[in-house]
A protein has these predicted regions:
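N-terminal small/glycine-rich loop or linker at the start of catalytic domains
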Residues: 5-34, 65, 72-78, 127-158, ...
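Alpha-helix-loop-beta-strand connector modules within alpha/beta enzyme cores
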Residues: 109-121, 198-215
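Active-site-proximal, glycine-rich beta->alpha crossover segments in alpha/beta enzymes
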Residues: 77-174
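Catalytic beta/alpha-barrel core
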Residues: 216-223, 240-250
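Conserved, mostly hydrophobic/aromatic
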Residues: 10, 51, 116, 175, ...
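Glycine-rich, proline-tolerant flexible connector loops at the mouths of alpha/beta enzymes
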Residues: 62-74, 183-197
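Conserved small/polar residues in nucleotide/adenosyl-binding loops
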Residues: 323-329
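N-terminal amphipathic alpha-helix/helix-capping segment at the start of soluble metabolic enzymes
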Residues: 1-9, 113-115
Length: 333
């Protein structure tokens, strides 16, 4: 966050606790996904699996971005993916969004963070997360993932201002109070918005979710989003964004000079991580050699990770090699 030069970058991966990992698979034999998320003891055990097996620098709260929608009153289940009993529209919003104090529903996340931190070694920290406001609206309103150039309508702006942003602000506060070092906003469908609307939306989002928590909230978006728009916000000291996560479609090396503050997280391809081990290693070598073209001062602020989350088809030996070959200081000196 402070962009101090480091010979060895910190590393964490989105979905580092997940279906590719034998530890997670064993837990899923006895518990549902919702139990692993909502029972703090199990959430801590799930989050600690990749820390113990792969020695990542950071644990990630084990949870799901959609629980705030359930907290608001929407009927959410996982079979195995998320399903809603009904989706939001202008006609049913008042009958579906019924909970008066939705943040109370989210208390399990705070306890999960506390229990995970209790088990972490002293040299490791924990990252929390929330879903991006537009991503939650897209799920709630059943907006097709293929949609592009969306212009926000009055109903969506009302949801954003009066429902989603206030709850996410409380959710971030809850996670930070429980001990999260940083809370990431994972906004995986923000690229659906038209450019003018994206700028408007990001202004509202950062004004509501980052200014009260200076340098404590990071932002991630993907799939062709205009990162220049986000970087303009990141470089504004009044916004106090902790950092930016980028996908694998861009050259990460360009972004250290474009950003004047905060971290830049990414961006080895999660698809390369799914390759057979003998095919994965050359791709990792290319990535490491590209980053070695920058000295520690030039890549200050880098958090080593992926362009998105670890995929379920990832061979478990690949994350082991990723941490061992990427992290040793001898590689990056």
């Amino acid at each position: 966050i402070t962009r101090k030069p480091q010979a060895c970058p910190p590393i964490w991966l989105m979905r580092q606790a997940g279906r590719y990992h034998e530890h997670y698979q064993r837990l899923k034999e006895e518990h549902t996904f919702e139990e692993l998320c909502k029972k703090p003891r199990l959430a801590a055990e799930t989050a600690m699996g990749p820390i113990n097996d792969f020695d990542f620098d950071v644990a990630i709260l084990f949870s799901d971005i959609l629980f705030p929608l359930e907290a608001l009153g929407m009927d959410l289940s996982y079979n195995p993916g998320p399903q809603f009993g009904l989706h939001l529209d202008e006609n049913n919003a008042e009958s579906l969004l019924v909970n008066e104090n939705p943040i109370n529903f989210m208390e399990f996340q705070g306890e999960a963070i506390e229990r995970t931190i209790e088990r972490l070694p002293g040299d490791k920290s924990l990252i929390g997360f929330v879903g991006g406001p537009w991503t939650l609206i897209a799920y709630a309103c059943n907006i097709s993932k293929d949609s592009r150039n969306i212009n926000l309508n009055n109903f969506q702006i009302g949801l954003l201002d009066n429902v989603i942003l206030p709850l996410l602000k409380e959710n971030i506060k809850l996670q930070l109070k429980a001990g999260a070092e940083i809370v990431m906003i994972f906004d995986s469908t923000a690229h659906q918005l038209a450019e003018e609307d994206l700028n408007f939306y990001l202004g509202k989002t950062f004004d509501a979710l980052t200014k009260e928590f200076p340098n404590k909230v990071g932002y991630y978006a993907k799939d062709g989003i205009n990162y220049e728009t986000i970087i303009e916000k990141q470089n504004n000291p009044e916004i106090s964004l902790a950092g930016l996560g980028v996908d694998s479609n861009i050259d990460l090396r360009d972004y250290f000079t474009k950003t004047s503050s905060g971290f830049v997280q990414g961006n080895f391809s999660e698809h390369f991580l799914t390759l057979p081990h003998e095919d994965f290693l050359p791709e990792l070598d290319v990535f490491i050699n590209q980053m070695l073209e920058l000295d520690p001062e030039e890549r200050a602020g880098w958090v080593c990770g992926l362009g998105h989350g670890v995929l379920k088809t990832t061979p478990q030996e690949n994350p082991v090699s990723y941490t061992h070959l990427t992290l040793p200081t001898t590689v990056f000196v």
